[in-house]
Amino acid sequence: STNEKLAKKQRKILGPLGRLLLKVFRWEIKGKIPDLEKMILIGIPHTAMRDAWYALLAVWALDLKVNFFGAAWVFTRLPSLFTISKNLDRLGIPWPFWWLQKYLMLKLGGIPVYRVNSRGLIRGAVEEFKVIDNYILVIAPEGGVEAVDQFRSGFYYLAKGLNIPYVP
């Protein structure tokens, strides 16, 4: 079935590639995404960096057009098993192709979140997304890749401010 309201993107190469790679990794997409013009899609659990990889493959496989919040360092640095910096925006390992990584992350719909100074993020996001007609905003409510006992509440206040549903 076709979803007429859902934010879609025609992908001639990445769509089939996403479907193929999900099959290779023995992942299966089950259920349906509601046919809504605007929604916040909750990405849980997000307790490892590979979660983002599988989410990206699913987005490609379903030909979805999404935006997502990501820690600022993810846009310019490589993941590291060890914490190198105490500054939450400078985690990971610097590398010479940071500019290409940032370009690709932004093209994929990424919105960098500077965690050291994230005050006003929800208010700013409400203002930005109010003027957009059709979108899926993906949020991982854990706020990082660490296992947590309780979700951060930003997704709720964002959905409330935009008067749109959040979908688990």
Predicted regions located by residue number:
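Soluble catalytic domains of membrane acyltransferases
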Residues: 7, 23-168
